């Protein structure tokens, strides 16, 4: 089973917590891939190196069935991890290693239990709705996905027209 580990380069936790996380993942035999920033932060904190084929970049390509993304940080880390999935149907687990964690519900303590449940297929998945935003700009059309919200920022004096659709039906 594959685990996509995601975190930002700035980590609130120390080397020992990172070693514990990696040890638990190895104990359960997960095939782990890490984003570049997380791999660099672990290397800096622990001296551990990862082979190039275990590191992914900005976007995540197709993954085998049973893949789970584990976001290690706070809510902002989880939201960025979801963004990097680009709408791929991969379950996401947030481990709260930051200061606040409304979306990252799993505590940093109890990793054996959490990853044991994943390995045994016992962790329940709660489907979440995604928001898709599309816009027509001077440089061309652009779209993006969001888990819980998006913002529109004004740049200069411009008119804004908004059409809102839910499940393909225009509602506003």
Regions found by a protein language model. Name each.
Residues 14-15, 76-82:
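Short glycine/serine/threonine-rich phosphate/pyrophosphate-binding segments
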Residues 42, 80-81, 102:
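Phosphate- and divalent-cation-binding pockets in alpha/beta enzyme and binding domains
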Residues 84-98, 102:
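Gly/Ser-rich helix-loop-strand patches that form or flank binding pockets
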Residues 10, 74-77, 98-100:
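Short glycine-rich anion-binding loops that position phosphate/pyrophosphate groups of nucleotides
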Residues 19-24, 86-87, 167:
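Short, solvent-exposed amphipathic alpha-helical segments in soluble enzyme
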Residues 1-68, 109-124, 135-144:
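ATP/NTP phosphate-donor binding region
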Residues 6, 71-73, 94-95:
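Short beta-strand segments
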Residues 98-172:
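Catalytic core of DAGKc-family lipid kinases
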